[in-house]
Amino acid sequence: MVDQEQFDISNVLIEALPYIKKFHNKKIMIKYGGHAMIDENAMSSTARDTVLLKYVGMQPIVVHGGGPEISRSMDKMGKEPKFIGGLRVTDKETMEIVKMVLVGKINTEIVSKLGFHGGKSVGISGKDSYLVEASRKGLTKVKHENGEVLEVDLGYVGKIDRVNKQLVDDLTNNNYIPVISPLGIDDDGNTLNLNADTVAGSIASEVNAEKLIVLTDVPGILTDPDDPESMIRRIRTDELKELIKDGIITGGMIPKVETCINAVENGVKTAHILDGRLNHSILLEIFTKHGIGTMVRE
């Protein structure tokens, strides 16, 4: 006799079928961040979701962050992390630690997790094959915690000039999942620290990704940060710009939202902000009618 659980599984598979067909052979950019980077269960769930996307015919691409781990490593080495207005100041010594943590630790851990769940992946950084060419930001206007606007030099912090997508295309065409550390390279061969959200959005646009998925520690875009029920399910880019202008979207959510806006306005079909703390959030967003996060479209 077939039990209810088996019926439920069949219903889930049938609901997923239209989306599997629609996104077959499409590139899906996933930005690993927040809880999905530090909690063992969340990391495992995210890796399984990513591998499943590959096995049902999609082409997942991963970009990861690593801010908290960088700060922890700096503390262990006796170097105090320095932030101005929430932005990391990256001197030469800090840059060496950033490279060590992003490429040598986090990237390899993600590749190992994907491999454990049956995924073929290759770890690279934005420096490889000049994937992400960048230049130093130089003097940057930063709003200090006391409200004062300062012009500061953040050191080896870069802005993206161009993305050369050939390496990513070569990997996805050969059935690998690229796992990308958010580093860039300048004209003099210097390594630059880049914002991981921005890297994910820029590469997603360049490779004509169907979706950009940003994993965070919030359910989605909230009109009231203290009320999960205020989450917006679907929103257009012009409406999002108004929410930023009106001060409804603030703080660390602004760069994530701006990344989604830029990606969608530059060729990505939809962008999604999801709660990486929720098991299988990627699958629930892609393969169900209503999803579980916020979807951004033009």
Curated annotation (Swiss-Prot):
SUPFAM superfamilies xrefs: Carbamate kinase-like
Sequence positions that bind substrate: 66-67, 88, 193
Site (Transition state stabilizer): 31, 256
GO biological process: arginine biosynthetic process via ornithine; L-arginine biosynthetic process
UniProt keyword Cytoplasm, yes or no: yes
Keywords: Amino-acid biosynthesis, Arginine biosynthesis, ATP-binding, Cytoplasm, Kinase, Nucleotide-binding, Transferase
UniProt-listed InterPro entries: AceGlu_kinase-like_sf (IPR036393), AcgluKinase_fam (IPR004662), ArgB (IPR037528), Asp/Glu/Uridylate_kinase (IPR001048), Glu/AcGlu_kinase (IPR001057), NAGK-C (IPR041727)
Family matches, as Pfam families: AA_kinase (PF00696)
Molecular-function GO term, any one: acetylglutamate kinase activity
HAMAP family in the record: ArgB (MF_00082)
Role according to the record: Catalyzes the ATP-dependent phosphorylation of N-acetyl-L-glutamate.
Family, as annotated: Belongs to the acetylglutamate kinase family. ArgB subfamily.
Protein name, per record: Acetylglutamate kinase
Organism of provenance: Methanosphaera stadtmanae (strain ATCC 43021 / DSM 3091 / JCM 11832 / MCB-3)
